[in-house]
């Protein structure tokens, strides 16, 4: 049997709404009319007058202003709306009724601001409450806070956070993406007790707190934690106090560790036992156990409670954390209690994150194929929480971390830092190089790292930790090719690392690129300059805030750039443009390995005209003269690899007439070139012969004449003896050219 409804403008309007709704095709005509009836019973007709604000009666607006939440217009305070009809009703509100409300608020925006700026205003006056629950009103309240009197602000904030509407929460979240708006809310909530209590009780607290506290802990967290203590003394708000306390302590305990006191522990243990909130109290204690000062209090005051709840996984986790400080030998047995249940949840991940700093635990994880397989599976879950993803990344970092050999200066700094922190370190055999390399191999076998790369696309907080992981993994030479295959290079060249100039990401890049053929990696779609730019920044850094020693890092960057410089002209050009200022300084570095690596890099770069111009540019430039002086000096240094590289640079410089003339402008002869023939190293002799061929084949007669006049130049060339056929051929070519030109000049 169908029920006919009299046609009215409101009914026609609602029918039109249903007709245009995307969900409407699933309802029969009767169901649509039933929806209309229920909505009318909920006095939705009063809300529809928003479509024509000029005809709104004061009594209707007063009714709307007294609604606790705008959603009550469609959720039927008088009649319970059936669950199968709630979706369409909410859609009617959010898509059809809310926009007219916002339009109405926009029209009267200036009038409202003038009205609300009066010091004598009563915040409950019609129709302020409704206005400030609209998206436009929320924006005006937060963005124009200086216009609104403080008393009114506090009231409106209370009303704002008292609203259970997700629309209200989402609008606050949107506005709080701006730092100024977040600061306003932080300051306002800190001084507004009622608004804070409403904030704590808001059903959208998790969303709102994540947005408001996104810049890190603030004094507000400490104030809210104290509010929770007071709220817990009221029976109706005990559950919400326990629910909120754990996350608040995480933010306020670093600066207020004394919040966990014997009195607090006694009071909340009693509350938990009386109200059946033991698990919630254990979660709070677990958070507090992350702080050394708090562990002492908890160990003394709550040990009995923890023992009484020993079947709880959180209680086992707390026991493990306390064992770290009071009975280290019990850490692994306690961890095994969690592992034996084969439950791979957040509790286990936190336990592994905490304990995997210990060598035996690292090996325990590596030997448990079931555990590694489940860690890999957890990362496939698109709904994995940021904390769980971070825990897995931390576990992997601990497992693949090598013991780093730092420079003497860096060791002294670390020693002083450790003394200041009174930290204790234990050397485990599992931390030696061979076991660490085997663990890295296991991690790669289970494909955990590539899944972490995918997770990092959703959680930016993983990026820094993954860069640190890759620094250590790339230290294992046999893993480098596999790292390239799973996308490590593309991950390390993400824009986020370039913007933050992440040193660890650049170090990892360098380590991988030292021993991988560039042509097998870089393409037009993925050019080498993507890697060159971040590595170039490391050459000038002196920051100690890295996973690796600075000097070693710079050395490896130079080696990686040397490899890239052999790739193509575009790479050489990019390196010259990005790194030359640093190379000018590093080539005179007192550390012989750094100087050698720099010279070898410039040798490869000298194939490019962009590099050569740095030596043979302007005639009277001090910069070019100084660089050439340094290279000439290095061609006679004691370190053979450095000599070889410097002589290689001279080969390229002498390949052009301007380069030969530049040498003559500094030395007036080619003595440095001739001297290469007397070196004991055949590689240097080879370079010397090529230089001589470049000179004697020059069409510039002045260059040729200067060589002939160089003391003992021709004599040294004629008397040069070698068993190498290639060198004999070069010697012969040079002598033939000399004799030919001398004969022609007669």
Swiss-Prot record:
GO terms for cellular component: cytoplasm; mitotic actomyosin contractile ring. The keyword Transcription does not apply. Keywords: Cell cycle, Cell division, Cytoplasm. The keyword Cytoplasm applies. One of its GO terms (biological process) is chaperone-mediated protein folding. Its main location: cytoplasm. It is found in: Cytoplasm. InterPro entries: ARM-like (IPR011989), ARM-type_fold (IPR016024). Signal peptide: none annotated. GO terms for molecular function: Hsp90 protein binding; myosin binding; protein folding chaperone; ribosome binding. Essential for actinomyosin ring assembly during cytokinesis. Has a role, in conjunction with F-actin, in assembling myosin II-containing proteins, such as myo2, at the division site. This is Ring assembly protein 3. It comes from Schizosaccharomyces pombe (strain 972 / ATCC 24843) (Fission yeast).
């Amino acid at each position: 049997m169908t029920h006919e409804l009299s046609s009215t403008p409101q009914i026609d309007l609602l029918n039109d709404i249903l007709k245009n709704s995307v969900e409407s095709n699933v309802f029969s005509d009767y169901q649509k009319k039933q929806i209309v009836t229920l909505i009318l019973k909920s006095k939705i007709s009063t809300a529809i007058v928003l479509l024509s604000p000029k005809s709104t009666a004061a009594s209707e607006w007063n009714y709307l202003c007294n609604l606790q939440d705008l959603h009550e217009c469609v959720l039927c305070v008088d009649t319970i709306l059936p669950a199968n009809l709630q979706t369409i009703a909410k859609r009617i509100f959010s898509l059809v009724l809310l926009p007219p409300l916002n339009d109405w608020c926009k029209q009267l925006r200036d009038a409202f601001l003038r009205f609300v700026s009066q010091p004598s205003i009563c915040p409950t006056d019609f129709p302020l409450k409704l206005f400030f629950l609209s998206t436009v009103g929320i924006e005006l309240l937060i963005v124009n806070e200086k216009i609104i009197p403080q008393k009114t602000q506090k009231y409106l904030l209370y009303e704002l956070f008292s609203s259970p509407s997700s629309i209200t929460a989402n609008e606050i979240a949107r506005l709080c993406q701006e730092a100024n708006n977040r600061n306003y809310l932080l300051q306002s909530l800190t001084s507004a007790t009622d608004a804070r209590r409403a904030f704590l009780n808001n059903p959208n607290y998790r969303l709102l707190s994540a947005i408001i506290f996104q810049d890190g802990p603030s004094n507000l967290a400490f104030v809210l934690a104290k509010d929770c203590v007071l709220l817990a003394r009221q029976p109706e708000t005990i559950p919400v106090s326990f629910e909120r306390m754990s996350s608040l302590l995480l933010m306020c305990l670093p600066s207020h560790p004394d919040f966990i006191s014997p009195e607090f522990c006694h009071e909340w243990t009693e509350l938990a036992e009386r109200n059946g909130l033991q698990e919630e109290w254990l979660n709070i204690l677990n958070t507090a156990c992350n702080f050394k000062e708090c562990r002492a209090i908890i160990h003394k005051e709550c040990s009995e409670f923890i023992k009484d709840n020993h079947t709880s996984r959180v209680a086992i986790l707390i026991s493990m954390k306390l064992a770290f400080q009071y009975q280290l030998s019990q850490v692994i047995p306690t961890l095994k209690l969690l592992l034996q249940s084969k439950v791979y949840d957040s509790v286990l991940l936190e336990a592994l994150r905490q304990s995997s700093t210990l060598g035996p635990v690292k090996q325990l994880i590596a030997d448990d194929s079931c555990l590694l397989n489940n860690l890999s599976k957890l990362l496939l879950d698109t709904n994995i929480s940021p904390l769980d993803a971070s825990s897995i990344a931390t576990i992997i970092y601990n497992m693949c971390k090598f013991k780093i050999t730092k420079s003497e200066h860096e060791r002294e700094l670390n020693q002083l830092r450790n003394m200041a922190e009174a930290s204790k370190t234990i050397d485990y055999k599992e931390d030696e190089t061979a076991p660490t390399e085997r663990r890295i191999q296991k991690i790669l076998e289970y494909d955990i790292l590539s899944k972490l790369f995918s997770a990092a696309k959703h959680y930016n907080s993983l990026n820094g930790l993954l860069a640190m992981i890759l620094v250590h993994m790339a230290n294992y030479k046999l893993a480098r090719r596999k790292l390239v295959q799973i996308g490590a290079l593309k991950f390390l060249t993400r824009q986020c690392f370039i913007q933050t100039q992440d040193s660890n990401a650049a170090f990892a890049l360098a380590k991988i690129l030292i021993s991988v053929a560039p042509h097998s990696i870089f393409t037009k779609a993925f050019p080498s300059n993507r890697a060159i730019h971040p590595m170039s920044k490391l050459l000038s850094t002196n920051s100690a805030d890295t996973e690796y020693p600075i000097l070693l890092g710079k050395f490896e960057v130079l080696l990686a750039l040397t490899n890239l410089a052999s790739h193509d002209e575009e790479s050489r050009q990019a390196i010259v443009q990005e790194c030359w200022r640093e190379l000018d300084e590093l080539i005179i570095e007192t550390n012989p390995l750094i100087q050698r690596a720099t010279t070898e890099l410039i040798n490869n770069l000298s194939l490019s005209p962009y590099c050569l111009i740095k030596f043979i540019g302007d005639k009277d430039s001090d910069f070019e003269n100084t660089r050439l002086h340094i290279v000439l000096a290095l061609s006679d240094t004691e370190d053979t690899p450095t000599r070889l590289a410097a002589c290689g640079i001279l080969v390229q410089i002498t390949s052009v007439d301007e380069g030969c003339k530049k040498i003559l402008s500094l030395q007036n002869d080619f003595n440095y070139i001739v001297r290469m023939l007397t070196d004991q190293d055949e590689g240097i002799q080879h370079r010397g012969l090529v230089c001589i061929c470049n000179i004697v084949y020059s069409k510039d007669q002045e260059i040729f004449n200067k060589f002939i006049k160089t003391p003992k130049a021709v004599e040294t060339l004629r008397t040069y003896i070698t068993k190498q056929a290639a060198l004999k051929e070069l010697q012969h070519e040079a002598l033939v050219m000399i004799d030919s030109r001398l004969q022609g000049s007669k």
